[in-house]
């Protein structure tokens, strides 16, 4: 689904966000953000002091106290609005998904047969394990697995892809998603979820930012911010008795007021990152959805940013896929036509692009027409990840084709001999980056079919970028080591796993994790499920099986394996945004310190005027300028929090240096300029 990226300050979103920001003033909502809760309490306290001054019970400047109270409320509202804007974008996405979810009827079957007795029931009443018949024109009532039949399915409501897809029993394209529509033929489907647990329900829940759980890094950062807040709270609280004692000892000036202390506390605690932290997390999930990837939690997005090993399937990710048969290379004593005949027979029921291309090449080279497997009384042997070969049993002939090691075992188990000349042919094809497919009949090796693999344009440069970021790329392929090595060298990956089985892939993930690395991978088949469940970031293809989608912690609606690289970029961007704004927020304190400390204590200690390096007009304008800047900086940083900081492929050390210069130095200098400009404006308006 190509989700339209909404403008940050779109009028409809802003109106809703303003209303939500006011609703969030409820203390039951505010206490969830400890830093902003302190500002919230300070707002109430200064408001009560202002009302007390107006009633005549307390002396002080009503104008100054009222202005401080007003801008403290603005600080809380701006932080609420940042979160509300992020949630508003997610809610808009969730609303569009809800539009897909319609009340529909289902044809419930008593058993898994197309002609079984059926009962018309509401889709909402279906439970896990129920069997349904879905015919042309019907909406798929639940997420499930196809047990019988095959059909063309329109998944545009979920994926945004207008071209229909084929869903059929068996293989890796047997799962259907509730809310999609069958265009032709029929399917018998077993429901795999209960109501409220469908993929569409999970998508809606995932993009509902208000209901998301905090990620581990977010929790850790919140603890740090709370600790800083407590330190500054204790420091500020001790200033009042210190001020009273100083005035009595020096017989000069007057004690610092509660209003000034509240202003000082609010300016010193990390309100900028405290106000934007939740918005950054919600926006990260939203950006992931914008890339057509559904993450099960913010934890998954965050883990993507920490990944340092990518396991990438060769076919479809590194190469274009759809390998094409290019040449028949017969073994000694075998003619090319004999090899082509056997290869075509073994591929007649093979619906893979490779199998189709073998049939076509045999036609083109020797005018071998397709033959009907049923009329030949043939039994097709499907490919499996364990045997790594397929074939056909026909008229006493046992033909197999597959990877060289698989055919070698097959031939030797039938008391045959694997000719060294065929090993040479295999090596020759592999050295050129092709994939050798060995064909055998019984215990006799007939030769090799050469399959061509084309590496995607620009993929080498993308891997070079990942290397700069400290991410190791590992190509996963079922090819032999020579072929894998040739393609790995051409694509520029760091390592490869050849002749991969599900067990080998799982073992490799565990090996990297034992070294303290975080691993990301993609998968679409049931055989990928164990590895997907083990990986730290597991992106399942939407076109894949239900088992793969349940094992992963992300689902790519476009079913594009290359998307894994983009997922890592989005995760890193979210972590960088959080870190950059934290640096900026803490660096801000320095300028506010130079503004407020002289203003608060210079009357008692005139020597502190030396710290007034900005030459602010008066103590009241200095304090008010710092409070106003503290509020406005949240507004100016909302776009950055929602869009994310600009991301460039470079090492972690280089990124740290770059962000310290931009956000650390920027956080030091910008407040000096901003506070001075606000002070000049207040003075011009006679408000200082």
From Swiss-Prot:
Q: Which family does it belong to?
A: Belongs to the cation transport ATPase (P-type) (TC 3.A.3) family. Type IA subfamily.
Job of this protein: Part of the high-affinity ATP-driven potassium transport (or Kdp) system, which catalyzes the hydrolysis of ATP coupled with the electrogenic transport of potassium into the cytoplasm. This subunit is responsible for energy coupling to the transport system and for the release of the potassium ions to the cytoplasm.
The protein's location, in the record's own words, is: Cell inner membrane
InterPro entries from the UniProt entry: ATPase_P-typ_cyto_dom_N, ATPase_P-typ_P_site, ATPase_P-typ_TM_dom_sf, ATPase_P-typ_transduc_dom_A_sf, HAD-like_sf, HAD_sf, P-type_ATPase_bsu_IA, P_typ_ATPase
Which residues are annotated as active site? Answer: 313
Bilayer disposition of the protein: Multi-pass membrane protein
Any one GO MF annotation of this record: P-type potassium transmembrane transporter activity
Which reaction does this enzyme catalyse, per its entry? K(+)(out) + ATP + H2O = K(+)(in) + ADP + phosphate + H(+)
Provide the species name: Yersinia pestis
Annotated membrane-spanning segments are 34-54, 62-82, 219-239, 260-280, 594-614, 622-642, 662-682
Give UniProt keywords alphabetically. ATP-binding, Cell inner membrane, Cell membrane, Ion transport, Magnesium, Membrane, Metal-binding, Nucleotide-binding, Phosphoprotein, Potassium, Potassium transport, Translocase, Transmembrane, Transmembrane helix, Transport
Recorded coiled-coil stretches: none
The gene for this chain is kdpB
Identify the stretch annotated as signal peptide in this record: none
**The protein's assembly and partners:** The system is composed of three essential subunits: KdpA, KdpB and KdpC.
Q: What is its EC number?
A: 7.2.2.6
Q: Which protein are we looking at?
A: Potassium-transporting ATPase ATP-binding subunit
For this record, an example GO cellular component is:
potassium ion-transporting ATPase complex
- Primary location recorded for the protein, binned into one broad class: membrane
Q: Does the keyword Transmembrane apply?
A: yes
One GO BP on record is:
potassium ion transmembrane transport
List positions binding ATP.
350, 354, 383-390, 401
| Enzyme class, UniProt record, top EC level | translocase
